[in-house]
Amino acid sequence: MAEIKYKRILLKLSGEAFKGATGYGIDIPTVRSIAHEIKHICLMGVEVAIVVGGGNIWRGATAAKEGIDRVSADYAGMLATIINALTLQDALEREGIVTRTQSALAVQQVAEPYICRRAIRHLEKGRVVIFAGGTGNPYMTTDTAAALRAIEIEADVLLMAKNKVDGVYTADPKKHPEATLFQHLTHMEAINKRLQVMDATALSLCLDNKLPIIVFDLQSSESLVSAISGQPIGTLISSES
């Protein structure tokens, strides 16, 4: 069994991770596959917290450009993350993994309110904790929520799972085939180069709190195991050069 480098992790799953090849919404087999990968690292003794996006259902910033009030659009996006969180919770529990969903929005019928100390206690008991509802504030992305929650629960690393993108490149590899992969960057380099790893607010939070980030392809075989074991995978962003 691989040796664990990161005992407590925050895994950021974008909404795109939920839609599989369907292009929109939720692809149940894809979600169950993700749950199976998460189960693997749980059984290794890793404490797992997850922040989910909602872009497979709704994108607040895009809706705002279409004329919808930005605050209302962002709250709708938060509700989309709750849908994804409940779907992932079900998939994890079908794998035998005890899971708790905490939401930054009050939806007491389906999720606990976000309470940091309670979340940490769940993790210490071996439960997976899914954070939904973003930060609970409009104008804040789920990447910022991921950075914030990772810092609050004192995670050892923030794992940014991407769809069919195996790290951070000098340019968009889909548009620029000549683009090269960064194996390592400092937080400041990622900010200064405007590489769109995540939004500047999230990156700044990670920089200020010296939180390492690993950007990797979720669909790559056993990528989560490689990431938590400290094996070379994707792009590592840290405070050290």
From Swiss-Prot:
GO cellular component terms given for this protein: cytoplasm
Annotated SUPFAM superfamilies: Carbamate kinase-like
Annotated binding of UMP, by residue: 54, 74, 135-142
Chain sites annotated for binding ATP: 12-15, 55, 59, 163, 169, 172
Subcellular location: Cytoplasm
GO molecular function term, any single one: UMP kinase activity
Keywords assigned: Allosteric enzyme, ATP-binding, Cytoplasm, Kinase, Nucleotide-binding, Pyrimidine biosynthesis, Transferase
Catalyses which reaction(s): UMP + ATP = UDP + ADP
Notes on how activity is controlled: Allosterically activated by GTP. Inhibited by UTP.
Keyword check for Nucleotide-binding: yes
GO annotation terms (biological process): 'de novo' CTP biosynthetic process; UDP biosynthetic process
InterPro entries reported in the protein's UniProt record: AceGlu_kinase-like_sf, Asp/Glu/Uridylate_kinase, Uridylate_kinase, Uridylate_kinase_bac
Pathway of action: Pyrimidine metabolism; CTP biosynthesis via de novo pathway; UDP from UMP (UMPK route): step 1/1
Region described as Involved in allosteric activation by GTP: 20-25
Subunit structure, as described in the record: Homohexamer.
PANTHER family named among the record's database cross-references: URIDYLATE KINASE, URIDYLATE KINASE PUMPKIN, CHLOROPLASTIC
Family: Belongs to the UMP kinase family.
HAMAP family in alphabetical order: PyrH_B
Described purpose of this protein according to its UniProt entry: Catalyzes the reversible phosphorylation of UMP to UDP.
Listed name of the protein: Uridylate kinase
Record gene name: pyrH
